[in-house]
């Protein structure tokens, strides 16, 4: 019996997060034993160049010595206290120092907790129940955000998972990404308390918002008294040191973070303006809590990560250069082989679509050739290149990847392209 079959005997589906099961690309997932730099190694000794990097957090690659040292030092003092620690204060100061429009922060344990809590605060402060989210944007698996599109952009959301009561999602309105008119329709009922969006969508591969769209969205929220939430769990510290703020310069009322902010440990956070955040308990009436929130080991990893990023701001140009080289190579090889492909790069994030037109929203993304992606994934994995096991996920570059790694990836794609 293989390890995956054995895992299925004890763990639901053999995995603890569905995408890891390789259902959308076929085959069995490699079980990873260790990571080092830009590479991961499975239990059979196979080596893979890792373009997932734990879905984004590992911007310095696996087993970075500075982060490893910070974690070991923290563990030696105790793994959890359930009490305040100075490292929480240090990390909070480092984060808020980057964002002049954010005054206070609250640490949690995951991106899902961050977005769920941000929406609770926004509803509590605005006094309105309805929220607007966008098709194709994923904000974690909390009930009110697990919705799919109805018959139109302004319809009430319908649950996209059994176990989510319709009453939970009836206050979730769906709009189309990069389509401001669909947002205006959602505002017509007068009961919208907040809007949540990935300003750089990383859960329909990579689709950045158009600046004009985000600018108008900011104006609409201000005009209608709705709180604007930027979900930067993925793009935070990845699109740039200050995430989407470096790309667009647009100020959200609340920003959620995750992934990079924890240095690879389970951490989430949400930060906002004082007038909003001071409504959280224990200062205000809106309740939010967590036994392991602000865990000293996770905070130490995040602090080491952020200090290293802030001391090397030039690294983002290098990361983006590598990502652009990879995507340009994919475009050239695809063209040589008559393959339709579209690519996007923002900072150290990249995405590509087997599609004849550049996707602007989820409808466009759904026109991509997912069967071709599945074959691409399988063939590249055989050759030692670990891309996301889903056409709807973003890829990531880390600092320890070099031109030789990129060239090897392009050579492998050149080899398989004629058969795709």
UniProtKB/Swiss-Prot annotation:
Major location (coarse): cytoplasm
Q: Which InterPro entries match?
A: 4pyrrol_synth_GluAld_NH2Trfase, Aminotrans_3, Aminotrans_3_PPA_site, PyrdxlP-dep_Trfase, PyrdxlP-dep_Trfase_major, PyrdxlP-dep_Trfase_small
**Keyword Cytoplasm part of the UniProt annotation:** yes
Q: Point out residues bearing the modification N6-(pyridoxal phosphate)lysine.
A: 259
Q: Which Gene3D superfamilies match?
A: Aspartate Aminotransferase, domain 1, Type I PLP-dependent aspartate aminotransferase-like (Major domain)
UniProt xrefs under HAMAP family:
HemL_aminotrans_3 (MF_00375)
Q: How does it assemble?
A: Homodimer.
Q: What is this protein called?
A: Glutamate-1-semialdehyde 2,1-aminomutase
- Gene name per UniProt: hemL
């Amino acid at each position: 019996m293989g390890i995956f079959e054995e895992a299925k005997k004890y763990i639901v589906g053999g995995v603890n997060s569905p995408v890891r099961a390789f259902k959308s690309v076929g085959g069995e997932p490699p079980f990873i034993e260790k990571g080092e730099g830009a590479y991961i190694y499975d239990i059979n000794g196979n080596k893979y160049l890792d373009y997932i990097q734990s879905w984004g957090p590992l911007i310095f690659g696996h087993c970075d010595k500075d982060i490893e040292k910070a974690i070991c030092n923290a563990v030696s003092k105790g793994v959890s206290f359930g009490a305040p620690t100075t490292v929480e204060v240090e990390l909070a100061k480092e984060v808020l120092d980057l964002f002049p429009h954010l005054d206070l922060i609250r640490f949690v344990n995951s991106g899902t907790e961050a977005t769920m809590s941000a929406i609770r605060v926004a509803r509590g402060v605005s006094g309105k129940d309805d929220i607007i989210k966008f098709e194709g944007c994923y904000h974690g698996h909390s009930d009110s955000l697990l919705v799919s599109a109805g018959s139109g952009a302004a319809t009430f959301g319908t649950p996209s998972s059994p176990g989510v009561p319709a009453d939970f999602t009836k206050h979730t309105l769906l709009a189309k990404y990069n389509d401001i008119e669909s947002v205006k329709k959602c505002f017509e009922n007068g009961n919208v308390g907040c809007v949540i969006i990935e300003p750089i969508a990383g859960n329909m591969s990579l689709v950045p918002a158009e600046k004009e769209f985000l600018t108008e969205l900011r104006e609409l929220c201000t005009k209608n008294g709705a709180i604007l939430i930027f979900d930067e769990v993925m793009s935070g510290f990845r699109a740039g040191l200050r995430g989407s703020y470096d790309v667009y310069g647009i100020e959200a009322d609340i920003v959620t973070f995750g992934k990079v902010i924890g240095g690879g440990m389970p951490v989430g956070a949400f930060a906002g303006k004082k007038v909003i955040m001071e409504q959280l308990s224990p200062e205000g009436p809106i309740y939010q809590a967590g036994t392991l929130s602000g865990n000293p080991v996770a905070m130490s990893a995040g602090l080491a990560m952020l200090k290293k990023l802030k001391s090397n701001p030039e690294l983002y140009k290098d990361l983006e250069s590598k990502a652009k080289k990879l995507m340009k190579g994919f475009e050239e090889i695809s063209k040589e082989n008559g393959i339709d492909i579209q690519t996007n790069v923002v900072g150290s994030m990249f995405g590509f679509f087997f599609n004849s037109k550049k996707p602007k929203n989820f409808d466009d993304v759904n026109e991509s050739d997912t069967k071709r992606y599945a074959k691409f994934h399988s063939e590249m994995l055989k050759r030692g290149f670990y891309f996301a096991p889903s056409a709807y996920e973003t890829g990531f570059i880390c600092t320890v990847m070099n031109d030789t790694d990129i060239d090897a990836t392009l050579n492998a794609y050149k080899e398989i392209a004629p058969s795709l």
